[in-house]
Amino acid sequence: MHCYATVVALLGAQIATALPQSQWKAVSGDEVVRAAVAFHQPKLAEAEALLMDISDPSSEKFGHYLELREVQEFFKPSDSSQKKVLQWLEDAGIDLSSVHLRKAAAVLEFSAPVKKLGKMLGAGVHVMHNDATGELRLEPTDHAVPSAIEDDVEFITLAQSKKTGKTKRSRAVKPVIDTLPPPYKLPVADDLRNCSESWTPACIRKLYGIPLGTKAAKNNSMGLFGYGDPYQPADLNQFWAKHAPFIPKGTKPKVKSINGAEAEGVPVEGEELLDIEMSYPIVYPQTVTMFQTPYNNKGGLANDFLDAVDASYCKYDGGDDPDFDPTFPVFGGFQGPAMCGKYKVTNVVSISFAIDEQTLSRRYIQRQCHEWMKLALSGVSVLVASGDRGVQGATQCTVNPYDANKSAFNSLFPGSCPYVTAVGATQVNFTGSRTNEVAVFDPKHNFYSGGGFSNMNAQPAYQRKAVANYLAANNPHYPKGTYNISGRAIPDVALLGANVTFLQDGKTTISGGTSAATPMFAAMINRINDERLLAGKKPIGFLNQILYQHPEVFTDITQGSNPGCDTAGFKAAKGWDPVSGMGSPKYPKLRDLLVSLP
């Protein structure tokens, strides 16, 4: 995620802009539309308890992850709920031959004339059409569920959304590129002090004690989430030749294109190029898979990726949100339909993009967070950058709910979801012969490790003790409402995110950001999974409970802070803190721990 970039990662934060109300017009009552009934999810609490059990190394059920199809079966609606909704539709005169039940998605779809749908949903509910985009939606959007089915149904929405408008690219965060002062000399990693100017792959391996890889288990490619920012293979070849000569020329990610996205081309910000250059030298000879998604100017993130790796998500809880997610076909772009369940997800996925929580709806965040839980239940490790603007989030602070004249801290999603591992950033300082890893602090680029507390997601049990210990000893005593003390706390860990060697457009520069740290940590986990698979074990899966139970596998980061919103932010301190999480990994100890687990 970026922020400072000496090129870097994009903190993908876009703000969705509402279309003028005058562009929305009522649809004719005779037009037939497709509607969707989203069932209640009574097993969500049960699913979370199951995840906490099978990811707890002290549990007898540790590692008993489910197949994705088993997860889908777990969430299907009850037979009684299905029968009640079908009876409601039949009583309303709906032709049941038009009904399609997506059990794994907990959604039932049906066709109805607009006039009849309005009567079914109650007075004042209309189907609206947007002349500019071709989209359809129900208004009011917060209409009530009919009383006959309110105990079984979460909400009812449209199952179709047309779009013919042309998308326009915009970026909320602009990267900064730092060039190295000439003449640039490749540092010799036998002494880390030689690495202070530019951290090459060899320097990074030396810092964390990572040996070169020698083996590659089958079906263990590391996943990278790509987001409309292509890379040039020529840059990779030059980077391998200069900084990772053990990687052969021509080595590049396996591309899984989603909804027509292009993976190779002229970079926009260089984010995906950075992800590849940070991860490949650690995972090689394992491979890297790029799940390439198109840029989304409507403000949402990653739903198209989740659709592509889990068909049930396409319609889960009413499907993707047309207010935030693209709809197909796109004028001048991908003609659709949107991909559903086309690819198998990798054991590890690294995500260097994020969005301010406050720019998304609560439903959007909760729906997607449930899907990250489903992937965790199936044994997938998801690593997400925590952000590069300290407690600010990406673009701006939010408003204090207790005092509108004061600001409040912001968090980034999806790192604020408790079912992913959020990664912060550090830098290395040298005092004489001493190497000291501290929280990144770069006022020049306004780059500070993203951290704090979610305003949308509750604090999970696995981190409550660590958070309570931190606040008991380091309470910043900010005004009430400055941060959500009961929210999911981030980050979980932190790694080097400053002055990393980066090559783009044939030029070696330095880069940074939590988007540099995240693929590094993901690559470490992928390496460890490789050893587990070769030993006949399963991938390690959801990491967070293990990490919080084993502070001995981390270097505790106790110096630094993450200012923002006209405050000093939080301070790094002993134990977990909302700047560096549990600290930076001691790879040999982390490897020994994770390989030893059943």
Give short role names for the model-derived ranges.
Residues 418, 422-466:
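Polar, glycine-rich mid-to-C-terminal structural blocks
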Residues 436-439, 501, 529:
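Membrane-proximal ectodomain caps of single-pass cell-surface receptors
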